[in-house]
């Protein structure tokens, strides 16, 4: 084995198996690009992103950890969200929840 080398079992890896997901169209109404990370509470994203915010409460992007989605000014794209797991308590971000979902 080479230091840092990955030895991955053949086959598919399903992310967030069994969790509820939701697809939303999201538009950037601002004049700057907006990037949202994999574990950011989507409900609390930049206000220049327009979408069904209430539906996104308690959800994050359904993408691999450490990755992000970038929304260019004027761009609309469909994203898939997945429910937050664990104790379902949210602190920080934009400060809109600060406790239990």
UniProtKB/Swiss-Prot annotation:
One of its GO terms (cellular component) is urease complex. GO terms for biological process: urea catabolic process. Keywords: Cytoplasm, Hydrolase. Disulfide bonds: none annotated. Its EC number is 3.5.1.5. Belongs to the urease beta subunit family. Heterotrimer of UreA (gamma), UreB (beta) and UreC (alpha) subunits. Three heterotrimers associate to form the active enzyme. This is Urease subunit beta. The lineage of its organism: Bacteria, Pseudomonadati, Pseudomonadota, Gammaproteobacteria, Pseudomonadales. The gene is ureB.
């Amino acid at each position: 084995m080479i230091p840092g080398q990955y030895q991955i079992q053949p086959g598919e890896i399903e992310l967030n198996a069994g969790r509820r997901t939701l697809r939303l169209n999201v538009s950037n109404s601002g004049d700057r690009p907006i990037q949202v990370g994999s574990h950011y509470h989507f409900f609390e994203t930049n206000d220049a992103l327009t979408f069904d915010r209430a539906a996104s409460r308690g959800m994050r992007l359904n993408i691999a950890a450490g990755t992000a989605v970038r929304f260019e000014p004027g761009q609309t794209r469909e994203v898939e969200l997945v429910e937050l797991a664990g104790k379902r308590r949210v602190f920080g971000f934009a400060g809109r929840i600060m406790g239990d979902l």
